[in-house]
UniProtKB/Swiss-Prot annotation:
Residues 19-26 are annotated as: G1. The lineage of its organism: Bacteria, Pseudomonadati, Chlamydiota, Chlamydiia, Parachlamydiales. Its main location: cytoplasm. It catalyses: GTP + H2O = GDP + phosphate + H(+). Residues 60-64 are annotated as: G2. The gene is tuf. It comes from Protochlamydia amoebophila (strain UWE25). GTP binds at residues 19-26, 81-85, 136-139. This is Elongation factor Tu.
Amino acid sequence: MAKETFQRKKPHVNVGTIGHVDHGKTTLTAAITKVLAEAGGAKFRDYASIDNTPEEKARGITINSSHVEYETDARHYAHVDCPGHADYVKNMITGAAQMDGAILVVAATDGAMPQTREHILLARQMQVPAIVVFLNKVDMLGESDSELLDLVEMELHELLESKGYHNSPIIRGSALRALEGDPKYVESIKQLMKIVDEAVPTPQRETDKPFLMPVEDVFSISGRGTVATGRVERGVVKINDKLQLIGLGDTRDTVATGLEMFNKILEEARAGENVGILLRGLTKTDIERGMCLVAPGTCTPHTEFKGPVYVLTKEEGGRHKPFFSGYRPQLYFRTTDVTGTIELPAGVEMVMPGDNVEITVKLIAPIAMEKGMRFAIREGGRTIGAGTVSEILK
């Protein structure tokens, strides 16, 4: 008898709380779970359980972050909250928490602070499509302070506009008072989630995107031809589909003449599946690990790009010393290392362990590259940093 399939009745969306330290990100996360738990859409998580974050590893970097889940009438959400500022930077740059939208928490008593700005900039660099603002701690201001609130809102709108976030909605409330059950502030949490439902776009499913599979291994089957194996990153491939092999050399056209998974023949392979693809007209020497099989014309090979990186501290297993322009590490993309030369921005003399900085990179060989793609920086096989491609130059 066939196994039952898991029914996804609602679209799934990933969100996260961002903002300056002590502006109430974790308290808001707790308040959302409490208010939605009362409506039957979540399990209440108190502040302490969210704040006590487990360590996780992403691309060799240790990150502390808490994941909670909840449902509104319209959607199922996975929500990430990070305790420390460095954890946010690492989380966003390594893509440990891919966000479809962010809830920016700003204390009305402070307004926009340095980390508020930095998190908005990071969200933009990481292509987070939408930001909804929760103006927290409004209960600490008197009724006469409504002009101050208007000023804070104006400043936030200007800041968000300058980073390309137009018409970001702002909801006023108090996460702490909502946690305490004050009806007025519970209502502001309900309003916030209604706005998040509307303002954060539903992400396109991975299977709806054009096909891409990074090659992990290659072997020949006598009498059949050459097989490339790997995990399908996105999209769908069917037998007899035309494909392109790109990266590390010249682009080659081919056709998928057969598909296998666990020695079973497939009609099609979908995002997330580990498969072998039999390729027409290619020999084993034409293909190597690190190349990508893609739907024709959907992805191109490049060697030069810009992007933000986070450099690990010594304690995190990173370098003990700074590096300078002209530094030549390995850059690990998808399934392979490629040597690249790093140039620092004008006015930046060196990068210390623990810094995050925007770098320009020239690779010695082209790879299938796209905006938003993640990479690790490695030295002698260990990860010493991680980054994201924010702009392709060549």
